[in-house]
Amino acid sequence: MALNKSMHPRNRYKDKPPDFVYLASKYPEFQKHVQTTLTGRVTLNFKDPEAVRALTCTLLKEDFGLTIEIPLERLIPTVPLRLNYIHWVEDLIGGQGNPQRGIDIGTGASCIYPLLGATMNGWFFLATEVDDICFNYAKKNVEQNHLAELIKVVKVPQKTLLMDALKEESIVYDFCMCNPPFFANQLEAKGVNSRNSRRPPPSSINTGGVTEIMAEGGELEFVKRVIHDSLQLKKRLRWYSCMLGKKCSLAPLKDELRKQGVAKVTHTEFCQGRTMRWALAWSFYDDVPVPSPPCKKRKLEKARKPLTFTVLKATVAELQAQTPHSSPTESVSAWLENILTDLKVLHKRVPGGEVELSLFLTAVENTWIHSRQKRREQGRHLRELPRAQEPPSEETSVTEQQQQPDIPPESPANAEALQHFLFKCLVNVKQEEEKDVLVEMHWVEGQNKDLMNQLCTCLKNALFRQVAKPT
């Protein structure tokens, strides 16, 4: 299943994927690699490195005005994925157009992160590279796009990450980016050690030199070395970040940062095509805002979806018969208010229109569970009675009443009780086209959303029970 809808919201390819027909008509080199199916659909063979390279070069030219060269024996980046990372860095550092300074660890032959960052946002980059071929291509790509004033490509020794690259620097950088080698050995690179044997093979080709795709210990150990460097550099960079090819690497790396006492940590997901990547970022600055991880965003989105049930037209008509001269929404709302009063759930009306009414609820005690238990107990007791009992004599009744302790009347919830509420929610009662009435319960805040689920079920059942009572 394609993941394009989960791309970063600012990614230009999120809602408008590349138009292969248009690109093929404009760029002859790209046109060589497109294929037309029997149904007339234009496709690209993503297992062909030349086709992937043609697409990358074409998109960079068409959408960013960049001209680059990439050798087939080195890593060929996909533009939507790299763009996701750039946009996330924008979120970390708090701006798209501000002049910022960044470091790209292992920039690759394409030098794609610095080229995109400089072109889109005017960022300054220090781009490091250990491989001779990648270094030469990266320098050439920077020069032919006239970006040498913004991007400095430097050749560094093997296993150099941040410490050696910055030993002669005194500048404070805003961020670093890194696309580390994902694999520890050839078997991993070929997918032999996949944790899921049922996982389908990759839909795209895996190009790249040895230093680009493999490192001792794989990406886990590589990123731990970046963390080790960051512990020495600390505030020389505002944000440290690394991309990850395996989700299973995320938890141990977060644990490592926690052990080292790093408080500002966040992560994200990069979704594109059929590929997912993850990224981790951390900072030693107290004043940097930390973007929410995607899982928290999804929980917030899920929380916004209301619980609903529908009161059908026939049921609404019965309610209206019992409450004359009232609209469908007014009848349903009035019955809901009666039930809520019986349950001792605080509620008040919120101004609304003719076709929609709203109630704001504050639950301070779980009375609906007690109500259900009480009904069950009454039913069980009635079933166990052998015969109808004689009504108590007036004398007995008076005696029992005298023996009962004084029970104070129910008092409304005080301010202290309201401070310790179970949850608050907004109930919307809406009339639909077929004269049905829709009841929505929107979570506002509280201890546990399951409590609102229980109350929703209780309201629905109580409403229908009242309608079903013989008149």
UniProtKB/Swiss-Prot annotation:
Recorded coiled-coil stretches: none
Regulation acting on activity, per entry: Methyltransferase activity is autoinhibited by the K-loop region that blocks S-adenosyl-L-methionine-binding. Upon activation, K-loop changes conformation, allowing S-adenosyl-L-methionine-binding and subsequent methyltransferase activity. mRNA N6-adenosine-methyltransferase activity is inhibited by zinc.
Catalyses which reaction(s): adenosine in U6 snRNA + S-adenosyl-L-methionine = N(6)-methyladenosine in U6 snRNA + S-adenosyl-L-homocysteine + H(+); an adenosine in mRNA + S-adenosyl-L-methionine = an N(6)-methyladenosine in mRNA + S-adenosyl-L-homocysteine + H(+)
EC number, as in UniProt: 2.1.1.348, 2.1.1.346
UniProt GO molecular function: mRNA m(6)A methyltransferase activity; RNA binding; RNA stem-loop binding; U6 snRNA (adenine-(43)-N(6))-methyltransferase activity; U6 snRNA 3'-end binding
Region of interest (Disordered), ranges: 375-412
Region described as K-loop: 159-163
Domain of life of the organism encoding this protein: Eukaryota
Region feature (VCR 2): 421-470
Keyword terms, alphabetized: Cytoplasm, Methyltransferase, Nucleus, RNA-binding, S-adenosyl-L-methionine, Transferase
General function of this protein: RNA N6-methyltransferase that methylates adenosine residues at the N(6) position of a subset of RNAs and is involved in S-adenosyl-L-methionine homeostasis by regulating expression of MAT2A transcripts. Able to N6-methylate a subset of mRNAs and U6 small nuclear RNAs (U6 snRNAs). In contrast to the METTL3-METTL14 heterodimer, only able to methylate a limited number of RNAs: requires both a 5'UACAGAGAA-3' nonamer sequence and a specific RNA structure.
Protein's name according to its UniProt entry: RNA N(6)-adenosine-methyltransferase mettl16
Gene name of this polypeptide: mettl16
